[in-house]
């Protein structure tokens, strides 16, 4: 059986760095998207139908499941999209169920950052990007469109949900290991294989 891993983010937990690493690593068949805030970069195997279906932007199951044809037996198959972990467009549970419908035995990977650090990161980002963003972080969190961000920080709810899945492994990575540059060893343990890395392509160094 060909293994498939789903990297869920979380947002503001080095997701773009992970996606760049997955994209350039020779041992990984990367089927995801790099969201780097400047522009999206797609892997050549990227399947927009799968991502849109799982995010509940459409109901085209037959198109979405064609992504299975892009799996490789001799590589680590990996899909990444941090929106799968959020409740934007649809509740995160519904998104995960759509993923499982296509990949019943997939393994999930999530990187969790301290909630306060995550909020500060979102706030700093929005201050740079959006004119009129409140400088006061309490006022910032009271904005209507920040309900999704606040919900995202309910890690306990999400962890409890994933633990109840019977056929799917759930790997949690502490964001601190990324900061300590220990992430390659963690990923190798999850994938159960040595990852080929070149200095120029190892964005974690």
State the predicted function of each range.
Residues 1-85, 106, 184-205:
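PAPS-dependent sulfotransferase catalytic core
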